[in-house]
Amino acid sequence: MFKKHTISLLIIFLLASAVLAKPIEAHTVSPVNPNAQQTTKTVMNWLAHLPNRTENRVLSGAFGGYSHDTFSMAEADRIRSATGQSPAIYGCDYARGWLETANIEDSIDVSCNGDLMSYWKNGGIPQISLHLANPAFQSGHFKTPITNDQYKKILDSSTVEGKRLNAMLSKIADGLQELENQGVPVLFRPLHEMNGEWFWWGLTSYNQKDNERISLYKQLYKKIYHYMTDTRGLDHLIWVYSPDANRDFKTDFYPGASYVDIVGLDAYFQDAYSINGYDQLTALNKPFAFTEVGPQTANGSFDYSLFINAIKQKYPKTIYFLAWNDEWSAAVNKGASALYHDSWTLNKGEIWNGDSLTPIVE
């Protein structure tokens, strides 16, 4: 009897050991586009796992300017001169929505693509944003408010306004296609700061909720998503939703989990420990980033070392930040070296290990 009992215990022990020894199944985070290119899938999954690391877990980022007008590698060069490091993410804006042009699509420029391709091939990740011209006008007017009736016309492809929007989207898609052809994944951030009252696609009054406007915004976002994804077949985009931290209704405009890969905040602040919206955005269960950041008072006195410390203490799910250029740049403020050399910060050249991304931590 004792012998049988011992054998039974031994069998149970061996079975339990086998179960415990079985490798834990990896948790994969996929892009919302089911047809995403394999490289884009790999990058998305890698980004989503960054918060599991103990260090090298927050990608640095910087805005390089507006394509054709101000875009160059100068911002990356300034940061490298100040810190000895280069930003992991480098941003370009295709849309110069303030320009008065004969045709609204002429405000779109994609000439930054060459530099973005090189940045990717040399170990960085490109980000593209859009300060779109206002289709309610012939061109320009990206900060001119529109009524909800005008908004509806923009959504209607049969109207003059709708055709203007489509002309811009077509040219943007052409530029994105160039990057896809080279296998370059893109952090794509359209229609940002929609909860603010300064861009035509957003609210019209300070912190005044407009449910119809919110619905129209969601329709516009989805229209752009379906055009890029279904009509144009662009499978290299990682879709980023980025409301403004200093306004209410941060998640009201959220178009849905099927349309967004990363959520973030555009945050201009004096106190890095008092940024609003982190809990609201992370509750959407998407990877979180500071999609645009800078000091509220841009006089060179801001200390960016406080920002990375705040990320570590208050916003630990952050996977990247993208600091604006010019007077908001880390290079012309304090603490740039501390920001770029912090143990949590991941810079260009630290993303890849040979031909593979650095290992994922489950």
UniProtKB/Swiss-Prot annotation:
Substrate binds at H131, W198, Y268, W324, N325. Induction: Up-regulated by konjac glucomannan and by cellobiose and mannobiose, the possible degradation products of glucomannan. Repressed by glucose via the carbon catabolite repression system. Also repressed by GmuR. The record marks H192 as: Plays an important role in maintaining the position of the catalytic nucleophile. It is an enzyme of class 3 (hydrolase). GO terms for biological process: polysaccharide catabolic process; substituted mannan metabolic process. InterPro entries: GH26_dom, Glyco_hydro_26, Glycoside_hydrolase_SF, MANB/E. The active site is at E193 (proton donor), E292 (nucleophile). Residues 38-349 form the GH26 domain. GO terms for molecular function: mannan endo-1,4-beta-mannosidase activity. It catalyses: Random hydrolysis of (1->4)-beta-D-mannosidic linkages in mannans, galactomannans and glucomannans. Involved in the degradation of glucomannan. Catalyzes the endo hydrolysis of beta-1,4-linked mannan, galactomannan and glucomannan. Belongs to the glycosyl hydrolase 26 family. Homodimer. This is Mannan endo-1,4-beta-mannosidase. It comes from Bacillus subtilis (strain 168).
